[in-house]
Curated annotation (Swiss-Prot):
Taxonomic placement: Bacteria, Pseudomonadati, Pseudomonadota, Gammaproteobacteria, Pseudomonadales
Cofactor: Zn(2+)
The keyword Ion transport appears for this protein: no
NCBIfam families named in the record: rRNA maturation RNase YbeY
Binding annotation for Zn(2+): 111, 115, 121
Species, as recorded: Azotobacter vinelandii (strain DJ / ATCC BAA-1303)
Subcellular location: Cytoplasm
An example Gene Ontology biological process: rRNA processing
Protein name as catalogued: Endoribonuclease YbeY
HAMAP family, A to Z: Endoribonucl_YbeY
Length: 162
């Protein structure tokens, strides 16, 4: 079971909470244990501040992942961590990349959840594994390959907004 805390700190239109839950559950289904996860949906000011504080990059990015570092057995439900998603960046990227907004949202939520599970894309081999899993999961939802186009930025690497 997934315990999802969806925190909305944006006035912009958003996918339904059921969509966020479906995307998270799909990404986390390899976990047999119950999980707790927070997704905070923010505007550019908060997104920029968090990215500056935690990654030392002075611009808002699409998704930030904060894996929990809680000793095992301390909580009834294992806390996976937090995702912070910058709503205007997601909207802008989807438009610039000619992607359906729901497909891009699904991709970024899945991408962030995989980071919370320990996946990364720093090394090429890790990136290939993570991207392959993202493609497979998104295909199950009926969405196209999010990496179909080498000129597109990876999640978490969005440069300063245009």
């Amino acid at each position: 079971m997934l315990e999802l805390d969806l925190q909305v700190a944006s006035v912009r239109p958003l996918p339904a909470e059921d969509d966020f839950r479906r995307w998270c559950e799909l990404a986390l289904r390899q976990r047999s244990a119950d999980s707790e996860l927070t997704i905070r949906l923010v505007d550019e000011e908060e997104g920029r501040e968090l990215n500056r504080t935690w990654r030392h990059k002075d611009y808002p990015t699409n998704v930030l992942s904060f894996p929990a570092e809680v000793p095992e057995g301390l909580l009834d439900i294992p806390l996976l961590g937090d995702l912070v998603i910058c709503v205007p960046v997601v909207e802008r990227e989807a438009a610039e990349q000619d992607k359906a907004a729901d497909a891009h949202w699904a991709h970024l939520v899945i991408h962030g959840c995989l980071h919370l599970l320990g996946y990364d894309h720093i090394e090429d081999a890790e990136a290939e594994e993570m991207e392959s899993l993202e493609r497979d999961l998104l295909a199950e939802l009926g969405y196209p390959d999010p990496y179909d186009g080498d000129d597109l930025p990876e999640p978490g690497t969005m440069s300063e907004g245009r």
